[in-house]
Design a protein with these regions (language model features):
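Autoinhibitory N-terminal propeptides
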Residues: 5-6, 17-140, 148, 369
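N-terminal domain-start motif of subtilase-like serine proteases
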Residues: 28-55, 118-168, 205-222, 371-372, ...
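C-terminal subdomain of the subtilisin-like protease fold in secreted/lumenal serine endopeptidases
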Residues: 49-51, 251, 294, 300-302, ...
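Subtilisin-like serine protease catalytic core
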Residues: 136-279, 298, 328-330, 344-345, ...
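Active-site core segment of subtilase-fold serine proteases
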Residues: 156-229, 237-250, 261, 408-509, ...
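Hydrolase catalytic cores
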Residues: 228, 236, 269-274, 285-301, ...
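Short acidic, glycine-rich surface-loop motifs adjacent to enzyme active sites
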Residues: 266, 288-315, 336, 488-495, ...
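C-terminal tail/sorting-segment detector
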Residues: 773-791
């Protein structure tokens, strides 16, 4: 996941109607930003803070309708409906009418865009893809033929030689590009790209262009070209690349490209541009529609999302996550777990009594100075935090300015002691941060330049009370140059047994005790991306396969200095790989795959951008052919691990196009390798089922297909633990390999039996729509109970 500065959310209360419960707090913060031109926001394309010239007329949004037939009602109210999946619509709506639209009877919930962040030679051998390509002990070789491999990402160079057929024609069937646009009345620009041969046949060519003429959507990142190359890069011709014999000096060789990907002959589809969740949803639907409609019959499809955001309730209930779950019925969607486990960005507290308090410091991830857009920030704290109660019970939340020299005594308290129903409470330093409705506090200004705003409400979907805070502070260099004033978070419980979960967006803030008495640090468990918590997806973590690499400048580089402790020991889970135990009882990710570090193709236009300063030191391979230069580069992250799994799943889909996401997850879990690293190092939750094994998984796919196992008999000889899978917010399935009958009992947390069901066979699908909301313990055939949450 690439790190970018978060947009500075401004606070403008004029004209706002608070308490619109169908708009979540994050959407309300986004609405403030869209309506305010006074405070600059960070533009990741220009890498500078810029002031909007005007308030946009429209914005994209996601609407969860009460009924699938409510589309006409939305359109009658001036809403432009772009796509619908299930009862969720992607729409364009006037910014001035957002509150009115969200209050319509046909609307259950409405969410505005949130920003998300970008989260092979050794790899193919490690997971068995080389054996699959060679057809070792298989009926044939598999390369992804007939399968659509889709990706939604930024920094895509579709004409990289890694994505061309041997005859030089493109492997891409379609590309969409979606970018924010002030000049477009809808607030975004949507462009379509087709192979030239297809484009020439189109009668309507509005905003349609040739893929062969596409350069890139971004000149500042290589991310999408890298992930696509891992998933499906297919160039096997000669390149110049670096090798080493002593892990000290490197030398150049010319030979067959060792850095191609997994699904080398699959059909490629991409959506690129600005990284906002609704643009991503639109892009996912583009890929699904292409797979369903571009051939005589629907094509099997896998989609890679090396993207995410840590802000959210971390379950399957957000509108975005429900949309992904709907799309997951038509394609296998793989989502990166996130790269935030190396810092405590989650905080979970079970309170034993009312009035109990937990305190932590909001600690800058990048201490000292940071220059951006011609301005320097000191100990920058910029981003969002969100705190969730386990039910409707409120809690007291305060953002506190503390004074280290006075024993961390509170200098300023920004209180959020009651449900504000979405109305923000804002403290600011004044000057550049003079905002309508804000409290200009002199002590706050003495400590920081910037602002803090917080609001709270009850989530109408889950019934949980939650609060959010938006923060941007830079240490005042006149009165706080030594950093004695710090920012802290305090939460006080309202009843015994209350549980509160707090998440940072992981961009510039984490939770730390600073080794101060009475303060606690955050936890790594909970660092999982919110988007990775959707139902009907595959969530992927990372483990290490390489911690050094040969570069074209003649040297070998790595993440560890000589004599230092090994930060990325080969075989272990990557320390950054995010994970979490969710409120509904699930542990994520499902599995880990090689993610540190991976060499793959990169965006030529980013490498040749002089502002980025690429040199042979940063490159592991290159080729000049036909007047264009192509490059290969190493990178690491769950962003790299996820397309490893997505590309391998494409090989499985070639073998059996009828695989569902449920089949895929089950086979992944059954065939994952549990070596000594998995069993003896790291956190068990972080590992998921273990190390992804593409080869063993494909053999299982073929075995089940041969005996009608997919969607029929389940093979899980070694699996004795029942698998409980949430299939919706109010439905789940239970599977126990080899069972002839299932007896399922659901208990309350107090141990009272509340539901009892039975069925013949090894699988039971449960419709819990009539159950009361809450946490249940599910016991299958007298075994160990597992926890689920019914919303």
């Amino acid at each position: 996941m690439r790190k970018f500065l978060l947009t500075v959310f401004s606070i403008c209360t004029a004209g706002m109607a608070f308490g619109q419960s169908k708009l979540d707090l994050q959407s309300q913060l986004e609405l403030y930003k869209l309506r305010n031109t006074a405070i600059p926001t960070y533009n990741s394309r220009t890498r500078a803070f810029e002031r909007p010239k005007s308030v946009p007329e429209n914005t994209m949004a996601m609407v969860e309708m009460k009924d699938q037939n409510d589309r006409a009602d939305l359109e009658a109210q001036g809403v432009k409906v772009l796509r619908v999946r299930g009862n969720i619509a992607i729409v364009v709506a006037p910014i001035k009418d957002i509150e009115r639209i969200s209050a319509l009877k046909c609307v259950r919930r409405m969410e505005l865009p949130r920003r998300v962040y970008q989260k092979m030679d050794v790899v193919r051998k490690e997971i068995g893809v080389d054996k699959i390509h060679q057809g070792v002990d298989l009926p044939q070789a598999y390369t992804g033929k007939g399968v659509v491999t889709g990706i939604v990402d930024g920094g895509i160079d579709p004409n990289h030689i890694n994505f061309l057929k041997p005859d030089g024609s493109t492997r891409f069937g379609y590309i969409s590009k979606i970018t924010a646009s002030q000049s477009n009345k809808d607030g975004y620009q949507f462009d379509n790209y087709y192979p030239r041969a297809v484009l020439d046949t189109l009668t309507n060519r509005d905003n349609a262009y040739a893929i062969e003429d596409f350069t890139t959507d971004s000149y500042t990142t290589f991310h999408g070209t890298h992930t696509t190359g891992i998933m499906a890069g297919g160039y096997k011709g000669n390149i110049t690349y670096a090798k080493t014999n002593d892990n000290d000096k490197s030398y150049k060789v010319t030979g067959p490209n060792p850095f191609y990907g997994c699904a080398t002959e699959s059909e490629l589809v991409a959506s690129c541009g600005d990284l906002r969740d609704q643009y991503i949803a639109f892009g996912v639907d583009d890929v699904v529609q292409y797979a369903q409609l571009s051939g005589k019959k629907p094509k099997p499809c896998v989609i890679n999302l090396s993207l995410g955001s840590n802000i959210g309730v971390h379950d399957s209930t957000s509108v975005m996550n429900r949309f992904l779950a709907e799309e997951g019925k038509h394609a296998i969607i793989c989502v990166a777990a996130g790269n935030e486990a190396n810092m405590g960005i989650a905080l979970k507290k079970d309170f034993a009594a009312a009035g109990e308090t937990v305190k932590t410091f909001l600690t800058p991830m990048q201490p000292d100075s940071l220059s951006s857009g011609g301005k320097t920030y000191y100990n920058l704290r910029n981003g969002q935090i969100a705190a969730y109660s386990n039910d409707s019970t409120a809690f007291d939340l305060q953002i506190v300015v503390t004074n280290t020299k006075r024993g961390n005594k509170a200098a300023v308290r920004i209180p959020l002691q009651n449900n504000t129903k979405g109305q923000p409470i804002t403290y600011a330093s004044g000057g550049d941060y003079s905002m309508s409705g804000a409290v200009i506090n002199q002590t706050f200004a003495k400590a920081f330049d910037g602002y803090v705003t917080a609001a709270s409400m009850i989530d109408p979907e889950t019934g949980r009370y939650y609060a959010m805070a938006q923060i941007m502070t830079s240490d005042n260099q006149k009165d706080n140059k030594d950093g004695n004033y710090k920012l802290a978070l305090e939460i006080k419980s309202k009843k015994p047994g209350q549980r509160v979960e707090v998440y940072s967006d992981a961009q510039f803030i984490y939770f730390d005790s600073n080794k101060q008495e009475g303060f606690v640090s955050g936890t790594r468990n909970g660092s999982i991306s919110d988007m990775a918590c959707a139902a009907n997806i595959v969530t992927v973590g990372s483990y290490n396969v390489r911690n050094h690499w040969s570069s074209l400048d003649g040297f070998v580089y790595g993440y560890n200095k000589r004599g230092d402790e090994d930060d990325f020991p080969e075989g272990e889970a990557s320390r950054f790989s995010s994970f979490g135990t969710l409120a509904d009882g699930r542990n994520l990710p499902h599995v880990c795959a090689p993610g540190a570090s991976i060499i793959s193709s990169v965006n030529t236009y980013a490498v040749e951008n002089p502002d980025l300063g690429y040199s042979d030191m940063a490159l592991q391979g290159k080729l000049e052919k036909g007047g264009k230069k192509y490059y290969w580069h190493q990178s690491l992250g769950t962003s790299m691990a996820t397309p490893v799994v997505a590309g391998a799943i494409a090989l499985w889909l070639e073998a059996n196009p009828s695989l569902t996401v449920k089949d895929v997850v089950r086979i992944i879990q059954q065939t994952a390798r549990k070596d000594n690293f998995v069993t003896n190092t790291g956190d068990p939750v972080q590992w998921g089922a273990g190390k992804f094994d593409a080869y063993a998984g494909l053999k299982q796919v073929l075995k089940e297909k041969e005996t009608n196992g997919i969607n029929g008999v389940r093979y899980a000889e070694s699996q004795e633990v029942p698998v409980i899978t949430m299939t919706g917010e109010r439905s789940f399935s239970a599977f126990l390999a080899g069972a002839k009958q299932l007896n399922l009992r659901a208990y309350s947390l107090s141990g009272q039996l509340v539901h009892s069901l039975s069925a013949q066979g090894d699988e039971l699908n449960v419709n819990a729509s009539s159950w009361n909301k809450g946490v249940y313990l599910i016991q299958v055939n007298g075994g160990k109970a597992q926890r689920i949450v019914i919303y």
